[in-house]
Amino acid sequence: MRNNTLKIYDMLSRGGFIAADSLDSTTRHLFDDIEENYEDYADYYREIGLRLEAGNGYYFFSRINEGKQIIEQKLDSFSKWLDYLDFLKCYDQTFTAGFQFRKSHIIEQISVDLELKEKAGRLFKKYDSSSNQDIVTKLIQEMMTIGFAECINETDETYKVTSAFRYAEELVNMIQIANEDEIPE
């Protein structure tokens, strides 16, 4: 067993990501350790039913032999990220790994862009979030919880999108490619 097995498990088992470009030195160290010892970690986690997956600058877990119900739950859970991604790309088409943004700028853009305002209103309907600030705060919290963004300046609330965000983009691209490949009736 490698030294960081438990730390890696704790971060990834909750649906998070370990990104190469994280601001957190511990996370970057874990990324480097996984990269150097990928086979050892992959073999270990495989024994407990987890698949250590590598993306473009990030790592995550998937389960081996997931049942249909679990896959459906994951798809349902990911459907909200389709809306989030749509909103973020509407805010700025260059919103991807490495992008930096300020919370206040997104809030300002919502107030001047009708399409963005409509998309924002649909993001957290079940919470009845009426203020743009609440909506943006919840979105940023979700991005930070999963590891898609990190705060780089607490004073002016500036954030950086991590390479783990590519996971969401890649899933959406796979869905779009699958739809394009379908033969119309």
Q: At which residue positions do the language-model features occur?
A:
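Eukaryotic partner-binding/assembly regions in large regulatory complexes
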Residues: M1-Q73
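Short, positively charged loop/turn segments that connect secondary-structure elements
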Residues: V112-D134
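Short basic alpha-helical hairpin corresponding to helix-turn-helix/winged-helix-like nucleic-acid-binding
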Residues: E53-E108
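A short, conserved structural fragment
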Residues: R46-A54, M144-E154
